[in-house]
Amino acid sequence: MDFQQLADVAEKWCSSTPFELIAAEETERRMDFYADPGVSFYVLCPDNGCGDSFHVWSESEDCLPFLQLAQDYISSCGKKTLHEVLEKVFKSFRPLLGLPDADDDAFEEYSADVEEEEPEADHPQMGVSQQ
């Protein structure tokens, strides 16, 4: 995928997150992202013919520890798309952005569903005769 296509993917991703693509350097194949309150990171994109993977980093010491999850994900087996990498970065930064953890949301929804169930009526068990 050429760099402009990657930048388009990044712009589309930004439209559904608090992040903004603040710089896209084609010569360096680098994209810089920013979100309030001071959360920033950049992605280095691999060349088309190169087997390299994406690389994420932050020049902010406050942000850098949160990128470990995304960095581990990128270095794991298999090719990753830019969208997959950005989603993992977003998940990593949720606490810094003041958002609930994505996994917590799923658990709360599941718990809420369980709590809303009405008690089941007593049904006769199969194979047990009632006399």
UniProtKB/Swiss-Prot annotation:
Subcellular location: Cytoplasm
Main location: cytoplasm
GO cellular component: cytoplasm
Key word tRNA-binding present: no
Highest taxon in the source lineage: Eukaryota
Post-translational changes noted in the entry: Phosphorylation at Tyr-34 is essential for its ability to promote megakaryocyte differentiation.
Positions of modified residues (Phosphotyrosine): Y34
Pfam families, sorted: DUF4581 (PF15167)
Biased composition (Acidic residues): 107-120
InterPro entries in alphabetical order: Maturin
Entry keyword set: Cytoplasm, Developmental protein, Phosphoprotein
Presence of the UniProt keyword Signal in the record: no
UniProt-listed GO biological process terms: negative regulation of NF-kappaB transcription factor activity; neuron development; positive regulation of ERK1 and ERK2 cascade; positive regulation of JNK cascade; positive regulation of megakaryocyte differentiation
Tissue specificity of this protein: Expressed in the thymus, bone marrow and spleen.
Annotated region (Disordered), positions in chain: 107-131
Protein family: Belongs to the MTURN family.
Function: Promotes megakaryocyte differentiation by enhancing ERK and JNK signaling as well as up-regulating RUNX1 and FLI1 expression. Represses NF-kappa-B transcriptional activity by inhibiting phosphorylation of RELA at 'Ser- 536'. May be involved in early neuronal development.
Protein name: Maturin
Species: Mus musculus (Mouse)
Originating gene: Mturn
